[in-house]
From Swiss-Prot:
Cited InterPro entries: Adenyl_kin_sub, Adenylat/UMP-CMP_kin, Adenylat_kinase_CS, Adenylate_kinase_lid-dom, P-loop_NTPase
Record protein name field: Adenylate kinase
Keyword ATP-binding: yes
Record's GO cellular component terms: cytoplasm; cytosol
Binding site for ATP: G10, A11, G12, K13, G14, T15, R123, V132, Y133, Q200
Keywords attached to this entry: ATP-binding, Cytoplasm, Kinase, Nucleotide biosynthesis, Nucleotide-binding, Transferase
Lineage: Bacteria, Pseudomonadati, Pseudomonadota, Gammaproteobacteria, Enterobacterales
Comment text on domains: Consists of three domains, a large central CORE domain and two small peripheral domains, NMPbind and LID, which undergo movements during catalysis. The LID domain closes over the site of phosphoryl transfer upon ATP binding. Assembling and dissambling the active center during each catalytic cycle provides an effective means to prevent ATP hydrolysis.
Native source species: Salmonella typhimurium (strain LT2 / SGSC1412 / ATCC 700720)
UniProt subcellular location: Cytoplasm
Subunit-structure text: Monomer.
Function according to Swiss-Prot or TrEMBL: Catalyzes the reversible transfer of the terminal phosphate group between ATP and AMP. Plays an important role in cellular energy homeostasis and in adenine nucleotide metabolism.
Pfam families assigned to the protein according to its UniProt record, in alphabetical order: ADK, ADK_lid
Disulphide linkage map: none
Length: 214
């Protein structure tokens, strides 16, 4: 089962990716992890990636596709894989197709921007333990304080409204066009496309995914 997850940051992909990996026994492939592993292994592709990154440049789509092909040929991908955060653009999706990488399901997590902002901006963190709260959905017993230690909770820089809105704009400009791309691919019979209502409770989203993936 070869799956691509699409959806804005904060749409709940990470939580459900974990569930899909455990339920279907497939690894999650993140391009960041893959690049780091390739550089560490010192493979030919890894050396190329290191040279580009050391020069402060972005790794080319061709190189990332070559790394994806190398990664999905490994034993743990025998039953499939889960791609999250790639492809990000239509040229990357085209390059994947040209490289012969077949995808069985493209799952879009649909959540309105305002709810995403609400979800992320309301997060509060106890830095020392990693405990995460939410002012609305999972508040601490005492406002602004960790339940266990009573220490102050903080907001991560990534969770500030300005940062979240900027990431959403980037997502809509770069990645959202992939939705139309993969819907057309599904119409042509090259993959299956499903939109998942990400506003539901975690268990309901999970049930919807099980229904789609079988």
């Amino acid at each position: 089962m070869r799956i691509i997850l699409l959806g804005a940051p904060g749409a709940g992909k990470g939580t459900q990716a974990q569930f899909i990996m455990e339920k279907y026994g497939i690894p999650q492939i993140s391009t960041g992890d893959m690049l780091r592993a390739a550089v560490k292994s010192g493979s030919e592709l890894g050396k190329q990636a290191k040279d580009i990154m050391d020069a402060g440049k972005l790794v080319t789509d061709e190189l990332v596709i070559a790394l994806v092909k190398e990664r999905i040929a490994q034993e743990d991908c025998r039953n499939g894989f889960l791609l999250d955060g790639f492809p990000r653009t239509i040229p990357q999706a085209d390059a994947m197709k040209e490289a012969g990488i077949v995808v069985d399901y493209v799952l879009e997590f649909d959540v309105p921007d305002e709810l995403i902002v609400d979800r992320i901006v309301g997060r509060r963190v106890h830095a020392a333990s990693g405990r995460v709260y939410h002012v609305k959905f999972n508040p601490p017993k005492v406002e602004g304080k960790d339940d266990v230690t009573g220490e102050d909770l903080t907001t991560r820089k990534d969770d500030q409204e300005e940062t979240v809105r900027k990431r959403l704009v980037e997502y809509h400009q770069m990645t959202a066009p992939l939705i139309g791309y993969y819907q057309k691919e599904a119409e042509a019979g090259n993959t299956k496309y499903a939109k998942v209502d990400g506003t539901q409770a975690v268990a309901d989203v999970r049930a919807a995914l099980e229904k789609i993936l079988g």
